[in-house]
Amino acid sequence: MNKIDAIEMEQMKKNIPGFRPGDTVKVQVKIVEGDKSRIQAFQGVVIGRQNGGIRESFTVRKISNGVGVERSFPLHSPSIDAIEVITRGQVRRAKLYYLRKLRGKASRIKEKKYVAGM
C-alpha cells in the first residue's frame, strides 16, 4: 500500500451502513450558520452511488411539497453526522434516474422482504 492509499484509509469513516440504490435512508447533515451548528435530516430514496473509496458519493431524492428534490452527499464527508437505513428497496438497476419522470404512486419502490430462519 502506498502513502496516498494509507492517508485515504485513515480518513474514511468506519460506521457507514450498507445501503444500495432503492433503499430509503435518513441522512443527518451538520449545518453551520454563523457560529451556531445544528443537525438537519434529509430522508429520501437513494437513486445512485458514484465512484469508490474516499471519493464515493451518493444521491438521495425526495418529494417536498410536490417538488422533487435531489441532493448528493460525499459518503465520507465530516458534515454527515449519521446515515440510517429506513427501508430496503427491491430494484433491478444501479441508477434510478427514471424516477425523475414518475409521479405519485408510480414512483413507489417495492420493499424487499426477508425470510427469517433459513
From Swiss-Prot:
A Pfam match: Ribosomal_L19
PROSITE patterns to which the protein is assigned, alphabetical: RIBOSOMAL_L19
Annotated transmembrane regions: none
Entry keywords, A to Z: Ribonucleoprotein, Ribosomal protein
GO molecular function, one term: structural constituent of ribosome
Keyword Ribosomal protein part of the UniProt annotation: yes
Function statement: This protein is located at the 30S-50S ribosomal subunit interface and may play a role in the structure and function of the aminoacyl-tRNA binding site.
HAMAP family, per database record: Ribosomal_bL19
Protein name: Large ribosomal subunit protein bL19
Organism: Geotalea daltonii (strain DSM 22248 / JCM 15807 / FRC-32)
Organism taxonomic ancestry: Bacteria, Pseudomonadati, Thermodesulfobacteriota, Desulfuromonadia, Geobacterales
